[in-house]
Amino acid sequence: MAERKKTLVLGASPNPVRFSHKAVKSLLRHDQEVVAVGFREGLIVEEEILTGHPPIEDVHTVSIYIGSSRQTDYYDYIFSLKPERVIFNPGTVNPEFMGRLKQAGIEPVSECMLVMLNDGEY
């Protein structure tokens, strides 16, 4: 079994066709601890979608599912979580933020989290 890594999915949606929704379900299937943060409250399986900037401890990975134009509102929040890495899923790549993360010693990853999970590279 892979090491458990608490992952915060940023941009989580209760809509089952959204990739953020699929990501939360996939993390749960892979026995990973997940925190879903989105713009609207809701549920993904049994996981509650939190809103705003909830204080969460021991976050290993932040997986981003929001476009770069909306990410600026979350810069300070993501830094406050002190993750080891931030995954920029397709359509979310933000070179400016990736550079800032790297300077802070946080690994920016430009990959699809779903593929990483399925390939055992998570």
Feature locations, PLM:
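Structural/interface elements that position substrates and couple domains in central-metabolism enzymes
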Residues: M1-H60, T72-N89, V93-Y122
